[in-house]
């Protein structure tokens, strides 16, 4: 029975490379001269440091540009609150979302069932497995999910006959 998986993954190494590029660019740019602006990574949590909120926004813009150039979908970034740290320096936590959350998975399954396609969906951890009798109906299901879910980056993997 043909099937495929709907997942949401981010290449950790590409994120690391983008952060290295951001830190290098911030270190060489004239408008950041003498500032302590940088980005640090701990697993899928990024911390953006800067002297003030304006520079923090500039560093975040550089980060999103570098991630986009490295084919990392910026919709997977979740910005946290801006926190004041020592003096007038600020930091912001940015979480890189991976995996299909259960609420989104339920929405995808409901969408597939409501479409009356002859496919079945099941939640398996952080992935959604969709299986059906025909390959064409699975491809229709892929197109349906691509059109409907635009606010979260999804990939379609393990297409099997």
From Swiss-Prot:
Superkingdom, taxonomy of origin: Bacteria
Organism: Nitrosospira multiformis (strain ATCC 25196 / NCIMB 11849 / C 71)
GO molecular function terms noted in the UniProt entry: nucleotide binding
InterPro entries: DUF520 (IPR007551), UPF0234_N (IPR035570), YajQ-like_sf (IPR036183)
Upper classification of the organism: Bacteria, Pseudomonadati, Pseudomonadota, Betaproteobacteria, Nitrosomonadales
Role noted for this protein: Nucleotide-binding protein.
Entries under SUPFAM superfamilies matching the protein: YajQ-like (SSF89963)
GO cellular component, one term: cytosol
Ranges in a coiled coil: none
Keywords: Nucleotide-binding
Similarity comment: family membership: Belongs to the YajQ family.
Protein name: Nucleotide-binding protein Nmul_A1044
């Amino acid at each position: 029975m043909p099937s495929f998986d709907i997942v949401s993954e981010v290449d950790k190494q590409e994120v690391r490379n983008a952060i290295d590029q951001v830190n290098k660019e911030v270190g060489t740019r004239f408008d950041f001269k003498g500032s302590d602006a940088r980005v640090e990574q701990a697993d899928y949590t990024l911390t953006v440091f800067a002297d003030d909120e304006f520079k923090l926004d500039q560093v975040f813009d550089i980060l999103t540009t570098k991630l986009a150039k490295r084919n990392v979908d910026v919709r997977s970034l979740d910005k946290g609150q801006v926190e004041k740290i020592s003096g007038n320096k600020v930091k912001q936590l940015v979480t890189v979302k991976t995996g299909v959350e259960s609420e989104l998975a339920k929405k995808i399954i409901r969408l597939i069932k409501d479409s009356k396609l002859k496919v079945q969906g099941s939640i398996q951890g952080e992935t959604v497995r969709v299986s059906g009798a025909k390959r064409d109906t699975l491809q229709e299901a892929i197109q349906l999910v691509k059109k409907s879910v635009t606010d979260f980056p999804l990939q379609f993997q393990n297409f099997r006959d």
